[in-house]
Amino acid sequence: MFNRAVSRLSRKRPPSDIHDSDGSSSSSHQTPKSTAKWASSLENLLEDPEGVKRFREFLKKEFSEENVLFWLACEDFKKTQDKKQMQEKAKEIYMTFLSSKASSQVNVEGQSRLNEKILEEPHPLMFQKLQDQIFNLMKYDSYSRFLKSDLFLKHKRTEEEDEESPDAQTAAKRASRIYNT
C-alpha cells in the first residue's frame, strides 16, 4: 500500500499543451523551467513529480531517501478519509519509519516519536510534527546540496539545451521556406 502511494505521488504528470494562436506549439510561451521552479523552494520541488523523482535519486545516493519517502507517506496519509485505511496507513508509516525496528527509520527527536498505542485512534495530522521535522531537515540540509549536485546541474543543462533546440529548428524551417530547400 505504501509503495503504491509513493509511486502515485511521484508519478510524472503529462505536460500541458501550450499553443500559439495559429495552433502550433510554442516554447516561448511555456511555463518556467522545472529546475528553476525546483530551485525556488523545496515546496515547489515536492509538488512536481519529476522533481520528487530527481530528489529521491539524489537522496538515495546520500543514504537518506527515507526522509522524502516518509514525507510523501505523511502527505498521502493526510488525504485518507476512511478510518480503517487511516489506521492501516498509520501502522505502516510507524513500522516503516518510526519504530525502533523500522526498515527505513527516519531521524527524529526521541521525545517526538509516537507511542504505538496512539495508532489505534489515528487522525490526519498525527504525524504533522514529525513530518515538519523531516521537512526542515531536508530543507536545510539535503535540499541545498541537491541544488549543487551533478544530478540537478545536469538536468538543468539538459533542460536549457532542450529549450534552445526548438528555436534552432524553427529558424531552420523558416530558412528552408524562404530558400525553397
Swiss-Prot record:
Residues 1-40, 157-181 are annotated as: Disordered. One of its GO terms (biological process) is G protein-coupled acetylcholine receptor signaling pathway. One of its GO terms (molecular function) is GTPase activator activity. A lipid is attached at C74 (S-palmitoyl cysteine). Keywords: Cytoplasm, GTPase activation, Lipoprotein, Nucleus, Palmitate, Phosphoprotein, Signal transduction inhibitor. Coiled coil: none annotated. Pfam families: RGS. Gene3D superfamilies: 1.10.196.10, Regulator of G-protein Signalling 4, domain 2. It is found in: Cytoplasm, Cytosol; Nucleus. Residues 29-40 have a biased composition (Polar residues). It comes from the Eukaryota. Signal peptide: none annotated. Residues 41-156 form the RGS domain. The modification Phosphoserine is found at S24, S41, S176. One of its GO terms (cellular component) is cytosol. Regulates G protein-coupled receptor signaling cascades, including signaling downstream of the muscarinic acetylcholine receptor CHRM2. Inhibits signal transduction by increasing the GTPase activity of G protein alpha subunits, thereby driving them into their inactive GDP-bound form. Modulates the activity of potassium channels that are activated in response to CHRM2 signaling. Activity on GNAZ is inhibited by palmitoylation of the G-protein. Interacts with GNAZ, GNAI1 and GNAI3. Associates specifically with the activated, GTP-bound forms of GNAZ and GNAI3. This is Regulator of G-protein signaling 10. It comes from Bos taurus. The gene is RGS10.
